[in-house]
Amino acid sequence: MVESLPTTFSDSVHIAVIGGTGLQSLEGFIPIATINPLTPWGYPSAPIHILSHNNTPIAFLSRHGTHHELAPHEIPNRANIAALRSMGVRTIIAFSAVGSLREEIKPRDFVVPDQVIDRTKGVRPFTFFEKGVVGHVGFADPFDERIAKVVRECGHALEGEGIVLHDKGTIICMEGPAFSTRAESHMYRSWGGSVINMSALPEAKLAREAEMVYQMICMATDYDCWHSTADVDVEMVMGHMHANGQNAKRLVGAVLDALNMRWSTIDSIRRRKNKPELANAQQHQIWRGRTYHFAWSISACYFSSE
């Protein structure tokens, strides 16, 4: 990114992309600003890049830091979500490298998960609800089916160009940074796990608490250790990561185009009905439907019923 970019951005940004291992930047997008918001939970993993995609501002955050210096248990997830929320973000598309727990999910394949099993150990701060702020959110369906549908449509449209996409799957989110034992890997398969990573949680839970729409896109780099014949070496994994990163950039561009098209249509309908207040900064409301409104200040957050 260009170092001389502005460090403030006054307009709301409604869509964010969180990049993980293998997707630490989004080349080809026009950089607008680089900001580093201070939240009640500290600074985010890295400065947030505001990029322009077809004249729409997009926020990009590198989950593991600018130079991939943060291990999964060191990621300031609350600060990341709070920083994006304070900028106006209401929709998050998150990418993550994963190990495959299924023969049919091959390295370089993409998975649009619909479920997650939490195998983290409580080491990571995992909620905004504390210190007198009490709240409970539903998490039966941890990812957003509306965004998932868009991702599936775009992914399948690109299948002739090297992208293979699986429509559903269950993530096993482990604590890390060590990988699974072979016994654990077989256990996760018996539970119905499709892929395994270290990043889905508490990121998805915090996004739900913050009333943000969240969908993860998984990029398989290798088979987990349950697989007896698929040897893994660093060179092979890095090759898969590079290919995944290139495919992810094409996929995210297509997804953003599709989302913008939907929002533009809703925007024009609302304007024709003489409701411009619903068509500008409040476009994100089409993705809402939660029980609480989330309000931020520099020092605290609170929830109030609708």
From Swiss-Prot:
Name a GO CC annotation attached to this entry. nucleus
* Residues binding substrate: 198, 222-224
Q: For this protein, what is the EC number?
A: 2.4.2.28
Gene Ontology molecular-function annotations: mRNA binding; S-methyl-5-thioadenosine phosphorylase activity
Keywords annotated in UniProt? Cytoplasm, Glycosyltransferase, Nucleus, Purine salvage, Transferase
The catalysed reaction is: S-methyl-5'-thioadenosine + phosphate = 5-(methylsulfanyl)-alpha-D-ribose 1-phosphate + adenine
Q: Where in the cell is it found?
A: Cytoplasm; Nucleus
User: Where does the chain cross the membrane?
Assistant: none
Please verify whether the record's keywords include Glycosyltransferase.
yes
Q: What top-level class of enzyme does the UniProt entry assign?
A: transferase
Where is it predominantly found?
cytoplasm
Which residues are phosphate-binding? 21, 63-64, 96-97, 199
Residues the record annotates as the site (Important for substrate specificity) are: 180, 234
- Pfam family, any one: PNP_UDP_1
Under the heading InterPro entries, the entry gives: MTAP (IPR010044), Nucleoside_phosphorylase_d (IPR000845), Nucleoside_phosphorylase_sf (IPR035994), Purine_phosphorylase-2_CS (IPR018099)
* One GO BP annotation of this record: glutamate biosynthetic process
Copy the pathway line from the protein's UniProt record: Amino-acid biosynthesis; L-methionine biosynthesis via salvage pathway; S-methyl-5-thio-alpha-D-ribose 1-phosphate from S-methyl-5'-thioadenosine (phosphorylase route): step 1/1
Q: Cite the record's note on assembly.
A: Homotrimer.
What's this chain's function?
Answer: Catalyzes the reversible phosphorylation of S-methyl-5'-thioadenosine (MTA) to adenine and 5-methylthioribose-1-phosphate. Involved in the breakdown of MTA, a major by-product of polyamine biosynthesis. Responsible for the first step in the methionine salvage pathway after MTA has been generated from S-adenosylmethionine. Has broad substrate specificity with 6-aminopurine nucleosides as preferred substrates.
Q: Family, per the entry?
A: Belongs to the PNP/MTAP phosphorylase family. MTAP subfamily.
HAMAP family xref list: MTAP (MF_01963)
Protein name according to UniProt? S-methyl-5'-thioadenosine phosphorylase
* UniProt organism field: Sclerotinia sclerotiorum (strain ATCC 18683 / 1980 / Ss-1) (White mold)
Organism lineage string: Eukaryota, Fungi, Dikarya, Ascomycota, Pezizomycotina
